[in-house]
Amino acid sequence: MISRVISATPYGFNGQIIEVEGDMSKGLPSLQIVGMGNKAIDESRDRVRSAIKNSSLDFPKGKIIINLAPAELPKDGSHFDLPIALSILCINGVLNQNDVSNAVFAGELALDGSLRPIRSAIITAEVAKNQKIKSVYVPAQNAEQAALVTGIDIFPVENLKSLFLHLKKEKIIKPIDRSSIKNVSHDHKNAPIIDDIYGQEQAKRAIQIAVAGRHNILLSGPPGSGKTMLAKSLKNLLPALSEDEIVEVTKLHSLGEHTIISNPIVDRPFRSPHHTASRASIIGGGSKVQPGEISLAHRGVLFLDELLEYPRTVLESLRQPLEDHEITVSRANGKFSFPANFLLVATMNPCPCGLLGDPEKTCVCSQNQILNYQKRLSGPLLDRIDLTVSVSRVPHEKLLNNKMSTKSQQDTFLSEIHKAYSIQRDRYKCSYKYNNDIPSSDVDKITSISESAKTFLTNAARKLDLSTRSYFKVIKVSRTIADLEGSASIEIPHVAESLQYRQINIG
């Protein structure tokens, strides 16, 4: 008798149905697993054997072959333990084939038969839904994550014995009640807010514009000027994730984190990889293809502190995802695409010593050193950054004499940003979400710009020798500024402010 149990495995950003087939023949007792599995799957032989025996169930005595089909697809992970165990129980006649049909199973077995959490439970659930399979069995710790996929029943399984009794209809496991799930937000409580920052009004304004329209921003200035604090304050200005975004972000993090993510990700990601991180860890890839930091920052923020300290190859690799909002990784066994729609927030020093343009201290760098340092940021990458802001140190006397306003600037910013979001939502319906999402081909059709503002922009673009990409970025940023001010059309002051942030003066 051949048994068949359905499972799933991640494949790129999506998943693939896997049939766990089992067969037993006469011969010396053995368990062989075939179908391009890795070492973790090979080791499952001993885990499964112990789990079945310690669950007071009989392990068959015979030559057992388990096939993970399709065989041509590489497979890894310990989540095949549970379907392998069920396939063996079907071979032994302890379970019937009908007991395990029309369901997807995934879970790692401990030696005592209990289930441990797995990676990518949400992808298992999504694959089941796409295949019109209504029941999914995953470890209890993963049930809330899998329950993000609606329209199917998610059964939280504590151990192999309880699942066996459920399948035999002796002791029923109830599917998870989605109404009882409470998503806990961490709210970036340790991050600074705008009110914590003294001075830097232009930089604060640029941060507000960046958040309101999802525009990439670069802050340049000497050490101690507050660049990093400004960048981190952006965390507390971001809107909450929508339900669809929670699913996307949780899928990516379930694939890419080194620790197993059991619960849904409900906060917007804020990723800040160190400048020594490898290209594969930031862009994605590796021998086992995984999403990199740019994909883990999807729907959130990628913060690159000291931008020019990153290798040139890493910086140049950002160009395509900044434009296309996804990254494609090519390997011998296929091409894998991951979403990478992030807000880039970067900081940099204007020169190697960091003091170029500082009003109090003198820069000790030669002109050649400054030029070579700034050349690390290529023109094409800089062209993809919407806002560049020079951040100077706040004089000490202003710090001591600073009087905090009784009105919260943070609350004002949040109110204006939410109004801008509402305007964009009404304008674009479901086509786009933010002003920065508009493709250049649609800018003229969608954005309303007055004739005087259009003439002003055309003259400025000619004088500043703006590229085509920069020209359209100025319009998009102008549209965001107009939205923040509640203006139906883009006017000259909006364009003038936007052009200030296109003055590429990183020193």
Predicted regions and their residues:
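P-loop NTPase nucleotide-binding/switch module
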Residues: 171-209, 213, 241-294
